[in-house]
Structure formats: C-alpha cells, structure tokens
Amino acid sequence: MPMISVLGKMFLWQREGPGGRWTCQTSRRVSSDPAWAVEWIELPRGLSLSSLGSARTLRGWSRSSRPSSVDSQDLPEVNVGDTVAMLPKSRRALTIQEIAALARSSLHGISQVVKDHVTKPTAMAQGRVAHLIEWKGWSKPSDSPAALESAFSSYSDLSEGEQEARFAAGVAEQFAIAEAKLRAWSSVDGEDSTDDSYDEDFAGGMDTDMAGQLPLGPHLQDLFTGHRFSRPVRQGSVEPESDCSQTVSPDTLCSSLCSLEDGLLGSPARLASQLLGDELLLAKLPPSRESAFRSLGPLEAQDSLYNSPLTESCLSPAEEEPAPCKDCQPLCPPLTGSWERQRQASDLASSGVVSLDEDEAEPEEQ
C-alpha cells in the first residue's frame, strides 16, 4: 500500500475497488517536529504527476487540519479525484486565448528589452540618429571617416538628456529649413506678390525686349516712352465731354506707321481703310449717342496704332510719366485706374461695336 510522509504526518492512500477513486487518510504523527520537505514518495501504479501535485497541496491542508491526537478513523476522507480543481490557477491548463496573450506579452517584452539594451545604445554609440538629423549640407563634400568617427564618439559621450536636447534641436532646425524653402517656392511662384508689382515687372521686361527687337520710328518711340491714354473727364453735367487724350494728326500717324515693318502691322493702305471705316461708322450713329462716340474717336484712331497684341501688352499704368509727347500736349491730368476702362473702350471701338452703358452710368453717379 503506498504511503507518503509529508510534514511529519503519514498519509495512507487507498483505492475503492478496481478502477475506483483514490482516497487519502492520515494515520499517525511520525515525529513531534514537523518536516517541511517530502521525505519519500511512493506512487501507485497509474498515478500521474497531477496526483503528485495534489499530494503536495495536502501540505497546507494537513497543517490546518485537526490536531494529531485525533484518531485517523475520525478524520473525514479527502477526495483527490478532481485534481484540476485542487491545483492553483497558475498550474491549471491554459486556454488557447490565454496562451496567445502570454505569447504576445512575452514577445513584446523581449522586443522592448532588445530595443532598450541592444538597438538604441548601438545606434546612439555609432551616432546614426545624430548624423541623420544634423546632416544638412547635401551639396557639401562628405567628411573623412576620421571626422565622422570623432563626431560619433562625441555624441555617444553625451548624457541622455544632452542627446535628447541635441536631437530636438536638430528636428526643430529641419522644420525651420523646410518652412523657409516653402516660403521661397511660394515667392518664386508669385503667390505673395500683388498684381500691380507683377504688372510693373512684366511691363518693364517687355519694354526692354521691344526696344531691342522692333525698329520703331521717332514718333512711336515717343509714344512708347512718355505718352499715355486716358479716359475723357467731364467738366460739368451741362458741358459736353472734353477729350483729355492726345490728338494725333493723320500725317503723324502715317509717318509713324511707315517706319514699322510691313509684316508687323500691315500696309498703310489697310490701316487707312480701317480709319475711314471708323469715320463712316461715326456718321451712321444717331445724334443722341454721337457726342459720346466722338469722344472715343481719337482713342480708336490711336488704338489702330496698336493692333498687334504684342505692342498693346507693352503699355501699362506703371510706365506713366507726366512728360508730354513732342507732337501733342495733354489737356488734363489722367485719372488713376482709367487704363482698364480706356482699353475696353478702344477694343470695342476697333471692333465696330460700341457699348455706351458705362458712359450713360457716369452722369448718374455724378
């Protein structure tokens, strides 16, 4: 019959018939001084290690049990058939979810330990992080290996706080460089510049190009440099409109046009026919609108000089000068912002379609 001596007590294992359950009973006290180790264990046939664990758990039960003076026959029997229930939670069979969670936590812990104790110190010691952050001169020649080694060693010699501060300073500097590049690109694209400054730059560049490419006559050169068109200004509500633009005689126009190349603006006969066609259009207009269109007559005559879009684009309000032309004198100072209205009126007059909505709206505003 198997017997186990644990904590100074003898445990008697009995089996209830063939194939029955194993029961354990305490018999007598072996010694007055309890021993905390298993003296000897004799397992019956077919008894698994789980039963051994159950026997070990009897250690605490035997100490908290009844006094040893009580006879073993008076003690209740302990059922050890359900060994899993007697095991502690850490020794029970784990489910697949618990095993997966344990594996994940173990893997995470291992990877974190490797990062903290292997990867991070190695990278800091070699200066890779500092080198990537502080390397700003892409176009500069690379330093010698000795210089790089000295930089790496100096970085690794710093304390952890100094390394973090240096790292943060490098990141902030990279952000500042990126922001400066974005501002430079936006200024190159013209997003920050106003329309007026853009027109001034464009007009100045076109004037230099036209002066070097086109063989202009003396009168047209004066027109390009010191001459501007302006809208007529009303002197009063009763008085008729007075033309403030410069009046150019037909002889001056012909002499200026003949100095240009034939391929640029066409033959003088074609321009003369356009001028005559405009005069015929003036005669056919009703009397109520004739006075308004007469004010546009010099404008359309001057606009025939600039049939080419290239020459029209050369004129902008940025080039306005008070010096008059040598063939004509201004009658009144030009108005600010009148260039767009004059261009619209001259385009309408040259195309043969007159829109007097703006001229009719001016008396209402005054």
From Swiss-Prot:
Entry-linked Pfam families: FAM131 (PF15010)
InterPro entries recorded: FAM131 (IPR026782)
Region: Disordered, residue numbers: 342-366
Ranges of Acidic residues composition bias in the record: 356-366
Family: Belongs to the FAM131 family.
Name this protein carries in UniProt: Protein FAM131A
Taxonomic lineage from the root: Eukaryota, Metazoa, Chordata, Craniata, Vertebrata
Gene: FAM131A
